[in-house]
């Protein structure tokens, strides 16, 4: 069944004038879109043992709200929020959530549930399992995510992740497609005019480049099991057929979509790259396609070491400044042929 590639494009008017932003989507996302923080719930029964508390603090990044009572984490730099549910005193909603989890997986306590979000309301599970399995999960850090972050901070506009499939011929076909199409797109794509003018300023010293690369992840790489399982859960049918998956990632580790290898073609790659490299006409993050990957990277400090960061991007519910926002308009980004 054909996928529909949709992006919401928002127009802000002052009287009859249109306030345009000429910054490319990938750069606007890099400078202004904070990654969505995940929600973490630790189910336990009675007080945690000392070794369990030590394990929790050892395996989770320090930028998790609720992990330590002695440290305050700035919300905009938080990777997530951790809450504790003691099943001996849990309320009805918490018990219902736990009962659903314990029916589908190991119910050994302590048990951690990690949930992400698409937009402001839609939650989906990122990982779940006993605390004893957390070390092998590599929730926030892996070699691929370290390299992907390095490339994005060095100026790559989009990093295309390639998760290999079971069929080596299909894997090689996707490699050849990426090897051919990405240099072609670098020559074809032109950035919007007016970058640097009032309303379209750049704030980071990261070079603004028309540069696209791909990063391969072996499906059997245990160090990348978190990413592989996440992408596979989004495309289970294609994964069961052994297909490779391709994921364009931009900004601060935002995945645009998980694309089966059988659907990747030059037209689709061009359409998606034009969207990500075009003027950011929708500054509201939640109204753009994609979802944020869990990455232990302090983007703010890396991008703005001197503290000269841009004003925060608007989110749903915030006004558009002077004047009124026109109704959002749907832009269909076709799959290609």
Regions found by a protein language model. Name each.
Residues 19-337:
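Non-globular targeting/processing and membrane-anchoring segments
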Residues 1-7:
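Bacterial N-terminal signal peptides that target proteins for export
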Residues 7-17:
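Bacterial N-terminal signal peptides
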């Amino acid at each position: 069944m054909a996928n529909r590639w949709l992006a919401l494009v928002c127009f802000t008017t002052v009287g009859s004038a249109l306030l345009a932003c000429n910054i490319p989507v990938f750069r606007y996302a890099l400078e202004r879109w904070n990654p969505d923080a995940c929600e973490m719930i630790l189910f336990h029964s009675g007080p945690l043992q000392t070794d369990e508390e030590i394990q929790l603090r050892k395996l989770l990044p320090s930028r998790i709200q609720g992990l330590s009572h002695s440290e305050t984490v700035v919300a905009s730099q938080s990777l997530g929020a951790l809450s504790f549910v003691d099943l001996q005193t849990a309320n009805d909603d918490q018990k219902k959530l736990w009962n659903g989890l314990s029916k589908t997986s190991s119910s050994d306590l302590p048990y951690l549930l990690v949930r992400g979000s698409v937009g402001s309301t839609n939650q989906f599970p990122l990982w779940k399992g006993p605390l004893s399995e957390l070390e092998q999960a590599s929730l926030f850090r892996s070699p691929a995510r370290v390299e992907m972050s390095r490339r994005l901070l060095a100026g790559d506009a989009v990093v295309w992740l390639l998760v290999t499939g079971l069929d080596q011929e299909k894997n090689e076909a996707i490699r050849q497609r990426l090897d051919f199409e990405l240099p072609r797109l670098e020559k074809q794509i032109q950035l919007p005019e007016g970058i640097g003018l009032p309303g379209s300023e750049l704030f980071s010293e990261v070079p603004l480049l028309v540069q696209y690369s791909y990063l391969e992840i072996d499906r059997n790489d245990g160090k990348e099991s978190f990413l592989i399982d996440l992408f596979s859960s989004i495309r289970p049918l294609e994964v069961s057929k052994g297909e490779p998956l391709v994921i364009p990632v931009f900004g601060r580790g935002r995945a645009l979509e998980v694309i089966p290898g059988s659907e990747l073609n030059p037209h689709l790659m061009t359409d998606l790259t034009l969207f990500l490299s075009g003027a950011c006409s929708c500054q509201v993050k939640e109204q753009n396609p994609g979802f944020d990957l869990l990455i232990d990277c302090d983007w703010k400090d890396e991008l703005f070491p001197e503290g000269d960061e841009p004003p925060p991007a608007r989110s749903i519910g915030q006004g558009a400044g002077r004047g009124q926002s026109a109704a959002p308009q749907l832009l269909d980004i076709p799959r290609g042929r």
